[in-house]
């Protein structure tokens, strides 16, 4: 039977700089929502020459299946990443968009004493100094090997959301970059794996918040 283990992953949000509080609601959105105008990929887990990424959903609810995303120790690469570069146009004028929540999942195998750290960092190219990172960790502190599909959703607090440029004219929301990285940690020869198995593959999806500007 195929199942997912839903985990908090000791999640934390790490902003690079404090942001002022603004009035906003995740139920607020422009009358005209943007449509994806371009998507590209980079990173060891989805190289631009052959990304092996399957995208589904519209800009409002994107999901990315990462078929070549794999970390393995001790006989492979302990860390792997995939960065999505996504741009959309057509939003109503006078709005800003920011990443609000991140969901990641995949198949995880950990020997006792091994752990998995994962990171999702987002920023807009128009203001690349402002970033926010969602970070989680899963250790295997038990006495047996862990082998399970895992999933985690983390919400970014309103004060830490990184906002894109204010829309006008073409309704360009900015070039959003979202980097997903995992790192396997061991203190010896333990086995660790994060990737796909027979019926699942690493994937990420996210949701947005909007505010007036």
Language-model region placement:
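Fungal secretory targeting signals
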Residues: 1-22
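N-terminal leader/pro-regions and domain N-caps
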Residues: 19-74
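Generic short beta-strand segments
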Residues: 61-71, 103-105, 179-184
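Extracellular-facing segments of soluble proteins and assemblies that are Gly/Ser/Thr-biased and enriched
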Residues: 76-128
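Extracellular and analogous surface-interaction loops
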Residues: 84-96, 164-170, 209-211
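Short helix-loop boundary/capping segments
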Residues: 110-164
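Internal, hydrophobic beta-strand segments that form the core of beta-sheet-rich folds
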Residues: 164-189
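Proprotein-processing/basic-patch segments
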Residues: 181-213
């Amino acid at each position: 039977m195929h199942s997912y283990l839903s985990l908090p992953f000791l999640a934390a949000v790490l902003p690079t700089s404090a942001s002022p509080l603004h009035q906003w609601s995740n139920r607020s959105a422009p009358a005209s929502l943007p449509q994806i105008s371009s998507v590209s990929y980079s990173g060891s887990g989805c190289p631009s020459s052959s990304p092996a990424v399957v995208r589904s959903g519209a800009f409002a609810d994107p999901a990315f299946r990462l078929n070549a995303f794999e970390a393995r120790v001790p006989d492979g690469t302990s860390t792997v990443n995939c960065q999505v570069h996504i741009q959309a146009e057509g939003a109503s004028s006078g709005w800003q968009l920011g990443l609000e929540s991140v969901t990641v999942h995949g198949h995880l195998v950990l020997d006792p004493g091994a752990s998995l750290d994962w990171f999702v960092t987002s920023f807009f190219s128009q203001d690349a100094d402002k970033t926010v990172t969602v970070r989680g960790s899963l250790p295997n502190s038990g006495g047996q090997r862990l082998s399970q599909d895992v999933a985690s959703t983390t919400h970014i607090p309103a004060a830490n959301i990184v906002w894109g440029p204010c829309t006008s004219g073409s309704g360009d929301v900015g070039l959003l970059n979202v980097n997903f990285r995992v790192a396997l940690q061991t203190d010896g020869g333990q086995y660790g794996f994060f990737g796909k198995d027979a019926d699942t593959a690493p994937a990420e999806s996210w949701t947005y918040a909007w505010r007036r500007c």
